[in-house]
């Protein structure tokens, strides 16, 4: 495993250790909980550092092989951070709303977007009654907004990185159905058993999410750079 991916001081400063109140916990997170303070569960940062290191090694290896990543985080306050980090490593992202069937029905959804865009470019909407034209334009605008981060994604991703398991549980379920590996931040109210690589951490604090996302993206970029260098050597 890569050493010194993150220090405990960095994790503490980013409030990664702060879980939820004890009465909101998921018992399956018990092995990742260090203690309870003032009725709030404290996450074991030693395990966080170790598992984040495992995840960083994994994404770097995949990036060296040219694999594609999809980042998912649809909470409004995460929209900008998620998009910026995904774009920093030339990866795909969903930061608005996860539409059911996005992965399990990917071919159909992708075809629908392409068909509407083609009709718009050909001026087809202008030949329709005003009400029908407005309806189709509204649908296309919605799909563009939701799928802005995956418009160039022509195939299913090789791995999906999820920020908020409870908010985007449907994404987790679709990945499991399609056997797409998942990396997921798991707070004390989450279920670590339904993802492939859990990273126990505070998924509510922006500083916590930003730190973990940043580390993963750094290692994806390292893998991508090594891949490019290997092509020229």
From Swiss-Prot:
One CC-aspect GO term: mitochondrial small ribosomal subunit
Keyword Plastid applies: yes
SUPFAM superfamilies for this protein: Ribosomal protein S2 (SSF52313)
GO molecular function, one term: structural constituent of ribosome
Keywords tagged on the record: Chloroplast, Plastid, Ribonucleoprotein, Ribosomal protein
InterPro entries: Ribosomal_uS2, Ribosomal_uS2_bac/mit/plastid, Ribosomal_uS2_CS, Ribosomal_uS2_flav_dom_sf
Family matches, as Pfam families: Ribosomal_S2 (PF00318)
Tree of life domain: Eukaryota
Any coiled-coil regions, as ranges: none
Subcellular location: Plastid, Chloroplast
GO biological-process terms attached to the record: translation
Protein family membership: Belongs to the universal ribosomal protein uS2 family.
Name this polypeptide is given: Small ribosomal subunit protein uS2c
Naturally occurring in which organism (per UniProt): Galdieria sulphuraria (Red alga)
């Amino acid at each position: 495993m890569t050493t010194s991916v993150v220090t405990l001081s960095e994790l503490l400063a980013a409030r990664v250790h702060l879980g939820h109140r004890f009465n909101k916990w998921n018992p399956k997170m018990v092995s990742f909980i260090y203690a309870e303070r003032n009725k709030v569960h404290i996450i074991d940062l030693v395990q966080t550092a170790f598992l984040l290191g495992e995840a960083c090694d994994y994404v770097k290896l995949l990036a060296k092989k040219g694999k594609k990543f999809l980042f998912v985080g649809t909470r409004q306050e995460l929209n900008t951070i998620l998009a910026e980090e995904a774009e920093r490593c030339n990866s795909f992202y969903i930061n608005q709303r996860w539409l059911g069937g996005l992965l399990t029905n990917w071919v159909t959804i992708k075809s629908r977007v392409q068909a509407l865009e083609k009709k718009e470019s050909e001026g087809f909407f202008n030949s329709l009654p005003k009400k029908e034209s407005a309806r189709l334009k509204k649908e296309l605008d919605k799909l563009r907004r939701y799928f802005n981060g995956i418009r160039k994604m022509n195939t299913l991703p090789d791995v999906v990185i999820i920020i908020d398991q409870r908010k985007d549980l449907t994404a987790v379920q679709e990945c499991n159905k399609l056997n797409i590996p998942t990396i997921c931040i798991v707070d004390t109210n989450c279920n670590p058993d339904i993802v492939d690589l859990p990273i126990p951490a505070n998924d509510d604090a922006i500083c916590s999410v930003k730190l973990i996302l940043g580390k993963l993206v750094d290692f994806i970029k390292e893998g991508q750079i090594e891949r490019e260098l290997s092509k020229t050597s």
